[in-house]
Amino acid sequence: MACITPWLARNYRTLGVPSLRSNFGAELRIGNGPGADGTWREYLHPTQNVYQMRRYQQLGEIAYVAGREREAVAFIREDFPRFLALCLKRFVYYWGGVPRLSEIPALAPIKNSVFLASSVLAFWGLGRALRKRQPGAWLLLWLILSYPAVYYAVFPHPRYRHPIEPELGILIVYVISEAQKKKGGQTEA
């Protein structure tokens, strides 16, 4: 708590609200609205859109974000099946790679293949760890279920996966080491 108190105080002084994050409504709207395709639509962000930046400056951050959240919630209520379909797409993009997000478009399929392969191996490792009742496996399950959930509602980006990649790496190493044991190729370290 001592680490975040200065940030809470800063936000209260600057924004009038003691919050850790204040931009959820704007992010929700970027991912949900007319033309939404499950990806980050940067052209709707105030830093990329002159009209949105003007609104942001006129209203202030808290009012702007609240307005964008109302727009997103209205869209979700109006077409909930579409929102669910977008959430499913974002789930696929989070674990399989976001399309068209490479600076070199020809590399995007390769990049996404590696992204997807690492996810499949991590899920496989998690499944094996749970079946074998490995200590801590349930913690990894809850991490993998809970951490990315918000990105299924807004939009995925490869950097949003970085915080859990060490755990995914552990699961990948686990499944590979289990495969080595099964083949009889285990060596003494």
Segments (PLM) and residue ranges:
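Membrane-interface anchor segments at the N-terminal boundary of transmembrane helices
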Residues: 68, 74-140
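Membrane-proximal stem/loop segments at transmembrane-domain junctions that anchor or position
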Residues: 12-89
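Internal alpha-helical transmembrane segments
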Residues: 1-17
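Transmembrane alpha-helices and membrane-interface helical segments
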Residues: 121-129, 144-145, 165-182
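Hydrophobic/aromatic-rich transmembrane helices and adjacent perimembrane loops
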Residues: 113-116, 150, 156-177
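Signature aromatic-anchored transmembrane alpha helix within multi-pass, membrane-resident enzymes
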Residues: 1-5, 137-141, 170, 175-189
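Transmembrane-helix signature of polytopic, lipid-linked glycan biosynthesis machinery
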Residues: 5-9, 96, 125-129, 143-158
